[in-house]
Swiss-Prot record:
Region Disordered, residue ranges: 1-51
Name of the protein in question: Carnosine N-methyltransferase
GO biological process, one term: methylation
Enzyme class: transferase
Function, in words: N-methyltransferase that catalyzes the formation of anserine (beta-alanyl-N(Pi)-methyl-L-histidine) from carnosine. Anserine, a methylated derivative of carnosine (beta-alanyl-L-histidine), is an abundant constituent of vertebrate skeletal muscles. Also methylates other L-histidine-containing di- and tripeptides such as Gly-Gly-His, Gly-His and homocarnosine (GABA-His).
Alphabetic keyword roster: Cytoplasm, Methyltransferase, Nucleus, S-adenosyl-L-methionine, Transferase
Substrates-to-products reaction catalysed: carnosine + S-adenosyl-L-methionine = anserine + S-adenosyl-L-homocysteine + H(+)
GO molecular function, one term: protein homodimerization activity
InterPro entries found in the cross-reference section: CARME (IPR012901), SAM-dependent_MTases_sf (IPR029063)
Lineage: Eukaryota, Metazoa, Chordata, Craniata, Vertebrata
Gene that encodes the chain: Carnmt1
Record-listed carnosine binding positions: D307, H338, Y389
Statement: the UniProt record of this protein carries the keyword tRNA-binding: no
EC identifiers of the protein: 2.1.1.22
Chief localisation class: cytoplasm
Amino acid sequence: MQRRQRAPPASQPAQDGGRSEDVEVQFSAGRLGSAAPAGPPARGTAEDEERLEREHFWKVINAFRYYGTSMHERVNRTERQFRSLPENQQKLLPQFPLHLDKIRKCIDHNQEILLTIVNDCIHMFENKEYGEDANGKIMPASTFDMDKLKSTLKQFVRDWSETGKAERDACYKPIIKEIIKNFPKERWDPSKVNILVPGAGLGRLAWEVAMLGYACQGNEWSFFMLFSSNFVLNRCSEINKYKLYPWIHQFSNNRRSADQIRPILFPDVDPHSLPPGSNFSMTAGDFQEIYSECNAWDCIATCFFIDTAHNVIDYIDTIWRILKPGGIWINLGPLLYHFENLANELSIELSYEDIKNVVLQYGFQLEVEKESVLSTYTVNDLSMMKYYYECVLFVVRKPQ
């Protein structure tokens, strides 16, 4: 049985949190809510917020449990359409039904992993419990939730597989390089350098920072990500022990049928291999609500994060307030605004030029700027279609 340490206050960097093989990564919960609020939320009672958050928690768990049913329906539809072809055309592809059967086996395997993940997350938070599932049975999940879940499976590729190494090198290495440059071990005690990684996803960037000896805390809002990162960070100690089939949902742009059903192994490293005395934790909740203590962080590292805001200026304001004087903000990512064109959602879509002007008006000093850092995001490396982002990398400093 692994033992847990008490989680640090969600709005503060962890202090002197020892980490060894028998100590789990601490997960503490702030306010997560039922969905991302459109602008300033209209506050209900605390009881209403707790109820909505509890419902959302179980709704996401239900999506994990419903995955197999949803995906089998998708494959069955494909088979029905194939069987509707003239018999002479079906005979041209005798291997096609066999391929669908292979996909079904992959679905069943993915479902086993997803059930393992959620079976371990009921009591994952140090400071919050969500009771028991009031419904008690698996219900159909929304298309939105199933898309989020399929996207989460691809996050395992990006963060914790050998296949995702090239993508991590493109996205994470430039950030880590700037951290090392600004906080060299010759002049800093890394354990005293508090680094925050908002939008931590499955936690690999934050983990890599902690591996260097820095005191690091990841923050994530999505239960899909939180359940999965808890599983990897706290339940996976054997390299490449687990297998997933992340590409079986992609029925287009496959060069070969085998490409669709190829597996990935995870984790490619032992997440428990952090150095003795490491200070690493995760918080769950809205970045802007959880982090309210002024002048608390030496460094904030954001990767593919700032375009998740309804209003990116709110993010800039929060970062300005919580950074220590002399602290730095490192950002890498595109501006694919998540709430653009969504009905009833506030979405302020600024150009990089506008964001840069706002950042400078707050008082940040620009130290590094690269406007064409080429990267992908959860890319299928064998797909016939790939998206590439020309990301912006900047480093700004809050004056002393």
